[in-house]
């Protein structure tokens, strides 16, 4: 099994940890992926991870967002243990998420409805949500494709 090598690209004066892993372990079946992982990411810090395929880099992001849960250990966000928060509650309360390497969208929904799906998790006011969606569509010059299903968009359009 390979090793994940975390590194700090830029560290600022603020040392308040916003994400912390304490003795986190995870297995897929009989295969141990993470074994008592400990690290923290401080507020305003730029942080990265390097490692060969299959050592758990994407798994760590899935654990942070709550898409999967650890076998052992604690995951903390802003000092609060979040192991038992469901993904949608974690996303809403802590305003976290990430775009996976192969896209974070619903293929059969339009661009507009993909944004709406995210907005329904993070914004309580439907009028404000629609205003925000329209603002983003306009800002990224996507008006002419807002009703096209995500599976028909180019790679660059999906990234926007």
Predicted ranges, named:
Residues 19-21, 34:
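Conserved structural motif at the start of ABC-family nucleotide-binding domains
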Residues 47-52:
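The feature captures the beta-strand-to-loop junction immediately N-terminal to the Walker
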Residues 65:
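Helix-to-loop junction immediately C-terminal to a conserved catalytic motif
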Residues 73-83, 91-94:
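Conserved ABC transporter NBD signature motif
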Residues 102, 108-121:
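Q-loop/switch helix immediately C-terminal to the Walker
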Residues 116, 127-145:
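Conserved ABC ATPase "signature" region
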Residues 149-153:
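Conserved ABC ATPase signature
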Residues 154-160:
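ABC ATPase nucleotide-binding domain "signature motif"
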């Amino acid at each position: 099994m390979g090793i994940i090598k975390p590194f700090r690209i830029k560290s600022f004066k603020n040392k308040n940890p916003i994400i912390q892993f304490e003795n986190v372990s995870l297995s897929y079946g009989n295969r141990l992926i993470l074994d008592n992982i400990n690290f923290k990411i401080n507020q305003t810090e730029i942080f990265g991870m390097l490692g060969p395929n299959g050592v758990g880099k994407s798994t760590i992001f899935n654990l942070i967002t709550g898409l999967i849960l650890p076998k052992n250990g604690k995951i903390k966000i802003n000092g609060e243990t979040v192991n038992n928060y469901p993904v949608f509650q974690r996303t809403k309360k802590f305003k976290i998420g990430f775009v996976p390497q192969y896209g974070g969208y619903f293929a059969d929904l339009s661009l507009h409805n993909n944004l709406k799906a995210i907005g329904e998790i993070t914004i309580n006011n439907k009028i404000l949500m629609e205003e925000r969606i329209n603002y983003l569509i306009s800002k990224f010059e996507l008006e002419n494709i807002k009703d096209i299903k995500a599976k028909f968009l180019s790679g660059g359009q999906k990234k926007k």
